A protein has these predicted regions:
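Short, flexible loop motifs at catalytic/binding sites
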Residues: 1-221
C-alpha cells in the first residue's frame, strides 16, 4: 500500500516483478516514484527494478528503460568476423538471428551474426560467452565484468567509453535487457519448439501463447 511505502526510509530499494504493480498505488503515485522518495537522504541511494515486461505503453519497466542514460545488452565476439553482437531473435524478414531448417527445427537451430551472417550453435556460444561485455545501444558506454579481480578476490567490474578509455563517472541510470537465449539452463532447441507451438496456436485462433512468448521468452513488451 502507499502507507507502507511512506513508513520506510531506505539506503537502497529493489522492486521485483515491476510490471505486476498497479499503475498507481492507491491513487497516490506510481510504485517507482513512491520507492524513490524513500531513498531521499540515503548516503549512496540505489534502486533496482526487474521484471518480465508486459503491455507496451503501460509497462513500468519500459518507462524506466526509455528514461535510462544507457541501455545495455550483452555482446560477445563472433568467431567468424570478430565483431561483437548480442543474441537477437531476428525473424523471417531478416537474415540474422535464430534460423533453422523446417524439416528439423530443433536439431538445426543456429544463431546468425548480424554482421557477417556466420552461424553458431549454442555450444559454440557457451564456449566463448564469458569474454563478452555489456554495451550501450548508443555505443558510448561499456561495462566490463572481471571475475575475481576485486578486493579479497571478489568479482568486480569497470566502465569504459566507446573508445576504451576508463570512465571516472559511470552512467547514473542504466537499463539492461536480457532474455532466455542467454541462459545455459534453457536450450535453443526448446525456445524454437515453444515458438512453433505458439505460432500453431495463433493460427488456430489463440494469440495468448505467442503474446506470452514475446513477454516471457524474448523479454519484450
Amino acid at each position: 500500500s502507499a502507507g507502507n511505502y511512506r513508513r520506510m526510509t531506505l539506503q537502497s530499494a529493489k522492486i521485483d516483478e515491476f510490471d505486476a504493480f498497479d499503475l498507481k498505488i492507491e491513487k497516490s503515485a506510481d510504485p517507482f516514484t513512491l520507492a524513490h522518495k524513500r531513498l531521499e537522504g540515503a548516503t549512496h541511494p540505489k534502486i533496482l527494478c526487474g521484471t518480465t515486461p508486459r503491455i507496451k505503453g503501460l509497462s513500468h519497466i519500459e518507462k524506466r528503460e526509455n528514461a535510462a542514460e544507457a541501455r545495455l545488452n550483452y555482446r560477445s565476439t563472433c568467431p567468424h568476423c570478430q565483431v561483437e553482437h548480442p543474441l537477437m531473435w531476428g525473424g523471417g524478414h531478416v537474415a540474422w538471428g535464430f534460423k533453422w531448417d523446417r524439416e528439423d527445427p530443433e536439431g538445426t537451430v543456429r544463431h546468425h551474426c548480424p554482421h557477417c551472417r556466420g552461424a553458431i550453435t549454442q555450444a559454440d556460444y557457451l564456449a566463448h560467452w564469458a569474454g563478452g561485455v555489456w554495451v550501450s545501444d548508443c555505443g558510448n558506454y561499456r561495462c566490463h565484468y572481471v571475475p575475481g579481480s576485486g578486493p579479497d578476490g571478489r568479482d568486480d567490474y569497470y566502465w569504459t567509453d566507446g573508445a576504451g578509455m576508463r570512465l571516472l563517472r559511470p552512467p547514473r541510470h542504466v537499463a539492461v535487457h536480457i532474455w532466455t537465449a542467454y541462459s545455459p539452463q534453457t536450450t535453443w532447441a526448446a525456445i524454437v519448439r515453444q515458438f512453433l507451438q505458439c505460432v500453431a496456436a495463433k493460427v488456430a485462433g489463440d494469440k495468448a501463447p505467442l503474446e506470452g512468448f514475446i513477454n516471457e521468452t524474448l523479454g519484450e513488451t
